[in-house]
Amino acid sequence: METMPNWLMQRAFLTPDRTAIEIEEEKVTFMQLHEKVVSVCEHLTHVGVKRGQKVAVLMKNGMEMITVIHALSYVGAVAVLLNTRLSREELLWQMDDAEVICLVTDQDFDAKDIPVYSFAEVMNGPKEEASIQEEFSLEEAMTIIYTSGTTGKPKGVILTYGNHWASAVGSSLNLGLRDDDCWLACMPMFHVGGLSLLMKNIMYGMRILLVPKYDADFIHKALQTRGVTIISVVSKMLTDLLERLGAETYPSSLRCMLLGGGPAPKPILETCVEKGIPVYQTYGMTETSSQICTLSADYMLTKVGSAGKPLFQCRLRIEKDGVVVPAFTEGEIVVKGPNVTGGYFNREDATRETIQNGWLHTGDLGYLDEEGFLYVLDRRSDLIISGGENIYPAQIEEVLLSHPAVAEAGVVGMTDDKWGQVPAAFVVKSGEVTEEEIIHFCEEKLAKYKVPKKACFLEELPRNASKKLLRRELRQLVEEM
């Protein structure tokens, strides 16, 4: 069993006085961060958190969440990171599925039969000496993050210490490291993209400028004045920043904008080239511990729409009906690497279906060009990407079908200037119901970003001979609106 020194403890030993985290007016060194984490460990130990247990974390970006995530790794517990934008019903389902022993949160939450510990109350309570892991086994689970499958049923992706380590190493081999690097972190840490920055922070010894909540004005100013060298963004954020930048440009010290959540439109990339802003487009998912492919800034205009090539220790191919296909042939994107999950929690069926001989079948469609650059054609075919959040129509359809006046339901993405896409619903009625009532019904059961922005009524939904819903025809109806 391969082990490594506890990452934060080792970093605090190697560079104790180096700045680890900046948040608002607070600066914390790696040694100070380690000391904070030990204190959280002792409080969590008092409330009964032990090695091997799964603990749900429902917190917003901030020093408190950072210390909780590290503290759980210190005691050997698995952090189940919950999306703060989900509804109570969705969160309860995930906690039950993950078999968590308690919830640590910074907000009011009634978790029924699961003990809920307010971070503030825990830290004001008694301490107990903690048994701290001085080494991590790379094979052990560190986190579980839920991702929706093509059926809409969430699956808990198990990411090991080895997965997180490989992801950080792959990123460093791709982007390089500098002594003056500072990564501006504005992505939620309950997403793997945001979480991966915490791993890089302690592994690289790199300063993180943490933004608790997305604030385009603050981020724009920080890029100009705070010595930021790298930032992770999605297309909407990039558009927001360019609007604020106007005729100016950012300092040359900004060496990378890492763009996820789908490719950027060519006009935006052209503007970035004119202003000397290096945009690295990426492709990844929870199952790959963040990015697995990156298109470097060298190719941002010559390979428009491409997600680039795999990270150094990763492999990628395109398969159709189980056969590897040549360049320019569309098929399923299949990936392999030490950053790829070994499977889903308590979902052996989904694990067997998705991971075969170490290769992860993403369900995404794409092709490779003659030079091996990846082009993603469809994100898991029916996926709606809204402001960087993944939305699966099947989950919304399940909610719609639970309404007594709904006989059939179909959901597709509708183009939106602000969010990229938003859900649009098509409904066949079995009783009297209005569009407003449908939307209000969804608001009570779904996260806000998953609620359909439009509900249209049809006599029947388009289906093929096998009665399978023809979403492409629904998309055509949306385009004709």
From Swiss-Prot:
Pathway-wise, it operates in: Quinol/quinone metabolism; 1,4-dihydroxy-2-naphthoate biosynthesis; 1,4-dihydroxy-2-naphthoate from chorismate: step 5/7; Quinol/quinone metabolism; menaquinone biosynthesis
Q: Which reaction does it catalyse?
A: 2-succinylbenzoate + ATP + CoA = 2-succinylbenzoyl-CoA + AMP + diphosphate
Q: Which UniProt keywords apply?
A: ATP-binding, Ligase, Menaquinone biosynthesis, Nucleotide-binding
Q: Which cysteines are joined by disulfide bonds?
A: none
Is the keyword Ligase in the record? yes
A GO MF annotation of the entry reads:
o-succinylbenzoate-CoA ligase activity
Q: Which Gene3D superfamilies match?
A: 3.30.300.30, N-terminal domain of ligase-like
Task: Please indicate which superkingdom the organism of origin belongs to.
Answer: Bacteria
What EC number(s) would the UniProt record show? 6.2.1.26
Query: Which InterPro entries does UniProt cross-reference here?
Result: AMP-bd_C (IPR025110), AMP-bd_C_sf (IPR045851), AMP-binding_CS (IPR020845), AMP-dep_synth/lig_dom (IPR000873), ANL_N_sf (IPR042099), MenE (IPR010192)
Per UniProt, the enzyme's principal EC class comes to ligase
What GO terms in the biological process aspect are recorded for it?
fatty acid metabolic process; menaquinone biosynthetic process
PANTHER family of this UniProt entry? ACYL-COA SYNTHETASE, MEDIUM-CHAIN ACYL-COA LIGASE ACSF2, MITOCHONDRIAL
What does this protein do, in the record's words?
Converts 2-succinylbenzoate (OSB) to 2-succinylbenzoyl-CoA (OSB-CoA).
Question: What family is this protein classified in?
Answer: Belongs to the ATP-dependent AMP-binding enzyme family. MenE subfamily.
The molecule here is called: 2-succinylbenzoate--CoA ligase
Per the record, the gene is: menE
